[in-house]
Amino acid sequence: MLISIPKDVKYIIDTFYKNGYEAFMVGGCIRDILLNRTPMDYDIATSAPPEITEKLFKKTIPTGIEHGTITVLIDKNPYEVTTYRTEGTYSDNRKPDSVTFISDIKEDLARRDFTINAFAYNDRKGLLDYFSGNTDLNRKLIKCVGNPDKRFKEDALRMLRAIRFSAQLNFNIDEKTFAAIKVNSSSIQNISKERIRVELSKTLLSNNAFSGMIKLEESKLLKEILPYNLNLDNSIDKVNPNISSRLAFIFLNLEPSLVESIMRDLTFDKNTMNKVISLTSSFKDIKSPDSKADCKRLIIKVGKDNIFDLINIYESINSKSVPDITNLVKEILDSNEVLYIKDLAIKGNDLIKELDITPGKILGELLNHLLNEVINETIDNDYASLITCAKNYIQNS
């Protein structure tokens, strides 16, 4: 089987061979090529010790030298090059306590997580597939290399990766592999929240998010990482594939304070957290609007940048479009109608001068009153109308 090797990768492999060492393109990049997908990156395994890798290439970074990994830079493009190795015990369910560098590619591939990631290829020896990974690709099956219980005890993150690959590729999970996930599910607590966030996000953003979430539930992993009353429904696959919308969908049953706590715990960034909270807290307010003013207030509550994602979540759950809301929102936004105090045709300083009032609580109340009147379309957004309304408000206060 011939596989096209990118120029930079070929240069790295050829450099090792010219200097008496072996090297292969390995892992997920070969899986992706065999599935006619574009690899995100290319990893290389070699019989050369890491110090030799550093000598053979001009620009390198010792990213994981203690485990044999050197990043080689070719025209600023990074390629991870790792020495063939076996691994010692895993006392933390994440990283080996020790590694031993070896010269046998088959022994190196035997430590990989899944058969579909245990490939090696170069144009001298062709495709090496010692663990029937190609068969499992054709069977659309996620299966551990060797003993699945051992694989998951070595690295508990592999359990989330199995389900993530299943969702991304629309593959089933081998029965023994899935059974081992159930048995070892509690050990996911040994994995950092950041790594859990990354895998959960990839599952949620896949084309088969519902299937992935159900597998997380059935495997007992979900109760370990998100033990809450989540909204698990197949309509999630219709939700816009951005992480804020997908998270908001599964968190619809939860109070905003709990959503915030969960997202902080999982180390989500502040912008994503705020958007998810806006979407979940505003969902109950979306309905066929009684007036344009109601629609404006919905936009104000959820934010201009989030309103169409909110509509999309509503449409996904109800399996119907809501053109009356969508069209009204578009009309409001396209015509730049007043939504915020800053949109008013008058400023706080104008009111201070015209009405001889002092900055403070009364000024804030006055500006909010003017905004409500404009939103309700009881007055126009022009200077004269706003001043008249403001004077009346002050007189009646």
State each model region's role:
Residues 1-397:
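Catalytic cores of the polymerase beta-like nucleotidyltransferase superfamily
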